[in-house]
Swiss-Prot record:
Record note on domains: The N-terminal domain is essential for RNAP assembly and basal transcription, whereas the C-terminal domain is involved in interaction with transcriptional regulators and with upstream promoter elements.
SUPFAM superfamilies assigned: C-terminal domain of RNA polymerase alpha subunit (SSF47789), Insert subdomain of RNA polymerase alpha subunit (SSF56553), RBP11-like subunits of RNA polymerase (SSF55257)
Record family assignment: Belongs to the RNA polymerase alpha chain family.
The keyword Phosphoprotein appears for this protein: no
Pfam families: RNA_pol_A_bac, RNA_pol_A_CTD, RNA_pol_L
Entry GO terms, CC: cytoplasm; DNA-directed RNA polymerase complex
Gene this protein is translated from: rpoA
Gene3D superfamilies, alphabetized: 5' to 3' exonuclease, C-terminal subdomain, DNA-directed RNA polymerase, insert domain, RNA polymerase, RBP11-like subunit
Keywords: DNA-directed RNA polymerase, Nucleotidyltransferase, Transcription, Transferase
Start and end residues of each stretch annotated as Alpha N-terminal domain (alpha-NTD): 1-231
Listed EC numbers: 2.7.7.6
Stored InterPro entries: DNA-dir_RNA_pol_insert (IPR011262), DNA-dir_RNA_pol_RpoA/D/Rpb3 (IPR011263), DNA-dir_RpoA (IPR011773), RBP11-like (IPR036603), RNAP_asu_C (IPR011260), RNApol_insert_sf (IPR036643)
Protein name listed in UniProt: DNA-directed RNA polymerase subunit alpha
Catalyzed reactions: RNA(n) + a ribonucleoside 5'-triphosphate = RNA(n+1) + diphosphate
Length: 328
């Protein structure tokens, strides 16, 4: 009796025009077409890395509800049009680009000044229209990311000193526009109960359908690899090993009050459940700056006090907190 599962032997990629393609894989054992097709589709739509504008500064504009003299669209519509520009960054994770245009006519994505390692996929995309004597001067920050990130959820390390006029955008990083799949019947010799997986993939051009399917498969393999590494009895799978006893430097077990920080800094730390020096040194500068009412001045004070004791932020402590430590 045959016990080995069939694996796909034929993989065909048929371009459908634009940035669309049909990917066909066969044969699969019955049921595997839906199992893998659904998993790949979900990963493609949710987990692909892409690029999107995340911040914009427009000369003469203080907020997104403003208008710009000589520009047909208001700022909200300019931002919506800007989200339609497809960027691709090579060997970098973020970049700030400049767009300057004067005179009557459309403002297109091709008017954005780009360095050699930044590519605009749809240069004819219209961002705005200028009237006679109109002028548009803006800076656009483009970042690498994954999924959809609302502007209201994005935090910045320099938020306490955020400049007036910087508009934060909702960012849709996903380069996938549409993914669908169907499962058809396949045949191998005398077997007719097999699956053929047919996927139609459409991207925005920042990534090809072939690259997208490879990247999604790689993500699935990496996520599932941990299950292939399970060893030992069934009991060992579900029982976590007992943590090894670890001795910490006594200074890490002291309360943050002993650092003699200002009342403002000490209260900010306690509000974040940071009671011990060991709790504090595991936080990064970025994490501390997100603490309400704790600004750059307080952060510098904390860093100086820690440095005087030979400590720094961003440390890693295994098995922290130790057993019996009162978390108050």
């Amino acid at each position: 009796m045959q016990t080995n599962l069939l694996k796909p032997k034929a993989i065909n990629v048929d371009p459908l025009g634009g940035h669309r393609a049909k990917v066909t894989l066969e044969p699969f054992e019955r049921g595997f077409g839906h199992t893998l097709g659904n998993a790949l589709r979900r990963v493609l739509l949710s987990s692909m890395v892409g690029y999107a504008p995340t911040e914009v500064t427009i000369a003469g504009v203080l907020h997104e509800y403003s208008t710009v003299d000589g520009v047909q669209e208001d700022v909200v519509h300019i931002m919506l049009n800007l989200k339609g520009v497809v960027f691709r960054l090579h060997n970098r994770d973020e970049v700030t680009l400049v767009l300057r245009k004067e005179g009557e006519g459309p403002v297109k994505a091709s008017d954005i000044q780009t360095p050699h390692d930044v590519e605009i996929i749809n240069p004819d995309h219209v961002i705005a229209h200028l009237a006679q004597g109109g002028k548009l001067d803006m800076q656009i920050k483009v970042e690498k990311g994954r999924g959809y990130v609302p502007g209201s959820m994005r935090r910045y390390a320099d938020e306490p000193t955020k400049s007036i006029g910087r508009i934060v955008l909702d960012a849709s990083f996903s380069p996938l526009k549409r993914v669908s799949y169907t499962v058809e019947s396949a045949r191998v010799e005398q077997r007719t109960d097999l699956d053929k997986l047919v996927m139609e993939i459409e991207t925005n051009g920042a990534i090809s359908p072939e690259e997208a399917i490879r990247a999604s498969a790689k993500i699935l393999v990496e996520q599932l690899a941990v299950f292939a590494q399970l060893e030992g009895s069934d009991l060992a799978i579900f029982e976590a090993p007992a943590p090894r006893a670890q001795h910490f430097d006594p200074i890490l077990l002291r309360p943050v009050d002993e650092l003699e920080l200002t009342v403002r800094s000490a209260n900010c730390l306690k509000a974040e459940n940071i009671y011990y020096i060991g709790d504090l040194i595991q936080r990064t500068e970025t994490e501390l700056l997100k603490t309400p009412n704790l600004g750059r001045k307080s952060l510098n004070e904390i860093k100086e006090v820690l440095a005087s004791r030979g400590l720094t932020l961003g440390a890693r402590l295994e098995n922290w907190p130790p057993q019996g430590l009162d978390k108050r």
